[in-house]
């Protein structure tokens, strides 16, 4: 939550205060991370020496288990949950009009509670804010990379809930 004019100015302020880099996970960056993670996991699976069979030969064996329809013969593919169009996302962040039933602090609080419950708190001890390291930031979450697209959709839905329709 911020009242700064731009998301970038808020992130820069946070980075300056905390003295560590802050990266905005935009839908484009999430999409790239998601696909890099998928690619790295498929490489790990295919290069894993513990598996007695390669992924491609396993796929060939699995294809034999299905009845083939000659008119629609194609290889099954992995789902590609691209980040859909996010209705409340623009200029690097999620926005609400302020005219809805929920106010910004309530929306942010609801998002945090949901994410903490699902992923836990990623507590960051900040030496930039407090040289003794006693200051803890709680705005972080331990979200697996492959779940980032669904988190963006979740945030969008909370922000839509705060809009008047």
UniProtKB/Swiss-Prot annotation:
Protein name per UniProt: Uncharacterized protein YPL034W
Organism the protein comes from: Saccharomyces cerevisiae (strain ATCC 204508 / S288c)
Protein origin, superkingdom: Eukaryota
InterPro entries on file: Meiosis_regulatory
Organism phylogeny: Eukaryota, Fungi, Dikarya, Ascomycota, Saccharomycotina
